[in-house]
Amino acid sequence: MGQTITEKIFSEHAGKKVYAGEIVRSPIDMVIGNDITTPISIRAFEEGGFEKLANPDGFAIVLDHFIPAKDIASANQAKISRDFALKHNLKNFFDEKDMGIEHALLPEKGLVIPGDVIIGADSHTCTHGALGAFSTGMGSTDISFGMITGGNWFKVPESIKVIFKGKPAPFVTGKDLILEIIRILGVDGALYKALEFTGDTIQYLSMDDRFSLCNMAIEAGAKNGIVAYDEITKEFLDKVGEANGGLRAEPKIHYSDEDANYCQVIEIDVAKLEPVIAYPYLPSNGHSVSQAVSDNIKVDQVFIGSCTNGRLSDFKIAAEILAGQKVARHVRLILTPGTQKILREATKLGYIDTLVDAGAVVSNPTCGACLGGYMGILGDNEVCISTTNRNFVGRMGSRSSKIYLANSAVAAASAISGYITDPRSL
C-alpha cells in the first residue's frame, strides 16, 4: 500500500514503514519555544534535574509575543528564556537583536528543512509544513520531553487530500484558500488529520501564500498542514541558504504515492473563488467579499501582520492599494511585519513610506495584537478587519469587539473606505 507524504516523513524518522494510526517514537529535528510557553518547559527541564539538552542546535527559542516587554510580568517571563539560552549557549536564540515572529523567522533563518519533524509550543507551528516538513504544535510538557530526549511520541495522522484546481483570480490568495477549506470542514472537521494541499493551483502559490495556507490548518483542527517540495520551494531555500551561509541540514524530499490512502478528498475550483471573509466568531464562518460588501460592515481598525500575513508580499499589495490614498478618518491601520528582515526589505522597496504616508502605523515584529496582548487591542464594541488567524470572542481585546478575518488586499482596501471593501472595486 502506498504512503502519504506525512507517513513517509515518519517512516524515515522511525526507521521503518509506518502508516496512519500507528504510534511511533520519532526523533525531532527542531524544537521551538517562545517567551510565553518556554518558561514552563524550562521549569520542567530543571525540576527534573536535567543539565544538558539532547540536541542544543535543534532547539530554538524565539521571543515574539511580548517583546520588547510590555510590562514587568512579560519582562520577567522573557528573562527566564534569556537566562536559559545564555546558560546553555543556545545558537538559535532570538530576541530584540534579531526579532521576528517565530513562524516567519525560522524559515527565513534556514532552520526549517523539507522532511523535518518539528514540534513547537505554539499552535501555529503547522506553518512550517509549507516547506514539506511535518510540523505541529504541542504543549510545554511535550516540548520539555523533546528538550530532554531529542524525540517524542506521535500517532501518525490520517490525511485529508485537498485538491485545488485552477488559477486564482486577482486578489485571491493562500489566505482565501485556507478560509474556504475551514468553511467547508468546520473548526474540528480535520481533527488530528494531516491536511495535504495538492493540485495544479499550487504552482501559482508563492511561498508566502503557502505559509498562510499551512498556518491556519490548525483552525480546522488539523495536526499538520503540508505542501510537497517543488521548484518554488527550491527557489526559496536556495535564497535562504545563500543569505545564511547554508541551510541547517540537507532537505529530505518526500512525495505521496499515487495509491496512498486518504480518509477524505476535497476538490475546490479555485478559479471560481473570490476573496473570503471569516465573520465573527469562528474562522469557519466564511462568506464571500461580495456578501461582506453588501452587509455594509463599518470597521474601526485594520490590522495587517502576524504569522499568517506579515510577509513581504502582504506589505507589497497593501502599498499598491494604498498608494496615493488616505486611511479613513475613523480608522486606524496597524502594520506588524513578521521579521526585522521583512521590515527592512519593505522599507528599502518603499512600501513602508507609502503606507505611513497613507496613515498607517508600523510596529516591531510581535504576536501582540493577534492575541489581544498589546500593539492593537480592541475596545468595547469595536470592529476590526484583520489578516490574523483567529476571530474568537475577545481574541484581540474586549469581549464585545468583533474581528473579521481577510487577506491583506481586502484589509488595505477597507482601510481607505472604512468599510469592508472588495479590492477589485478600486
Swiss-Prot record:
UniProt-annotated binding residues for [4Fe-4S] cluster: 307, 367, 370
Needed cofactors: [4Fe-4S] cluster
Domain of life of the native organism: Bacteria
Catalytic activity, reaction form: (2R,3S)-3-isopropylmalate = (2S)-2-isopropylmalate
EC number: 4.2.1.33
Free-text comment on the cofactor: Binds 1 [4Fe-4S] cluster per subunit.
Record-linked SUPFAM superfamilies: Aconitase iron-sulfur domain
A Pfam entry, by short name: Aconitase
Pathway: Amino-acid biosynthesis; L-leucine biosynthesis; L-leucine from 3-methyl-2-oxobutanoate: step 2/4
Statement: the UniProt record of this protein carries the keyword Iron: yes
CDD domains assigned: IPMI
GO biological process, one term: L-leucine biosynthetic process
Record's keyword terms, sorted: 4Fe-4S, Amino-acid biosynthesis, Branched-chain amino acid biosynthesis, Iron, Iron-sulfur, Leucine biosynthesis, Lyase, Metal-binding
Family membership noted in the UniProt record: Belongs to the aconitase/IPM isomerase family. LeuC type 2 subfamily.
Function: Catalyzes the isomerization between 2-isopropylmalate and 3-isopropylmalate, via the formation of 2-isopropylmaleate.
Complex and partners: Heterodimer of LeuC and LeuD.
NCBIfam families per UniProt: hacA_fam, IPMI_arch, LEU2, PRK00402.1
Protein name: 3-isopropylmalate dehydratase large subunit
Native source species: Aliarcobacter butzleri (strain RM4018)
Native organism taxonomy: Bacteria, Pseudomonadati, Campylobacterota, Epsilonproteobacteria, Campylobacterales
Gene: leuC
